[in-house]
């Protein structure tokens, strides 16, 4: 069975984007670039919602990042009821059926790892359905405040997280990899205990 990793870049206050801020919140460094090159050099399937797919399709055409060649070469699927093939990005396939149903089937049918980046609505649904094996959060040293938007965890279900990897990139950006578990309540006896009188 394939694993699914949800990959989320965010500010310290949890926003995936911010008005008036550049890509990577202006904090891109050599270790971050090397990490991205290595990550996308791995054999995997990239998973997108329609909005993020359109954005990345434009990024790889208009910008020059060292890992974009790998993005072009890797197989990609986009969940969308409106997009039609040809999609204008090499090795891309559209899936129009319900994303949760389709992802559960895809995970059973293949061994190749899958990775979804951005795609807030899609990844909220996949997380809520318990289909995400790894949650990779890269936290950039910025607080975006009122300018921030696209928070993945806002208004969603609750999760307990097992930390399996932590790395500091360029001395300032934190990459955390978790195994998520839907939160089912706090066990009795956990947390501060009231003193008996």
Model-derived segments and their meaning:
Residues 1-197:
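Enzymes that bind and transform nitrogen-containing heteroaromatic metabolites
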């Amino acid at each position: 069975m394939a694993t699914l990793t949800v990959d989320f870049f965010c500010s310290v206050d949890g926003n995936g984007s911010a008005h008036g801020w550049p890509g990577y919140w202006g904090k891109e460094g050599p270790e971050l670039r090397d990490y991205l090159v290595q990550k996308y050099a791995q054999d995997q399937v990239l998973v997108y919602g329609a909005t993020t797919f359109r954005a990345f399709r434009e990024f790889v055409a208009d910008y020059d990042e060292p890992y974009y060649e790998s993005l072009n070469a890797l197989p990609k699927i986009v969940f969308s009821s409106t997009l039609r093939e040809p999609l204008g990005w090499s090795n891309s396939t559209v899936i129009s059926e319900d994303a949760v149903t389709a992802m559960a089937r895809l995970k059973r049918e293949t061994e190749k790892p899958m990775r979804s980046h951005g795609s807030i609505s899609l990844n909220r649904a996949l997380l809520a359905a318990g289909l995400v094996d790894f949650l990779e959060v890269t936290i950039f040293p910025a607080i975006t405040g009122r300018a921030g938007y696209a928070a993945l965890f806002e208004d969603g279900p609750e999760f307990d997280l097992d930390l399996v990897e932590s790395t500091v990139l360029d001395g300032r950006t934190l990459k955390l990899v978790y195994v998520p578990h839907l939160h089912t309540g706090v066990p009795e006896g956990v947390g501060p205990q009231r003193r008996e009188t």
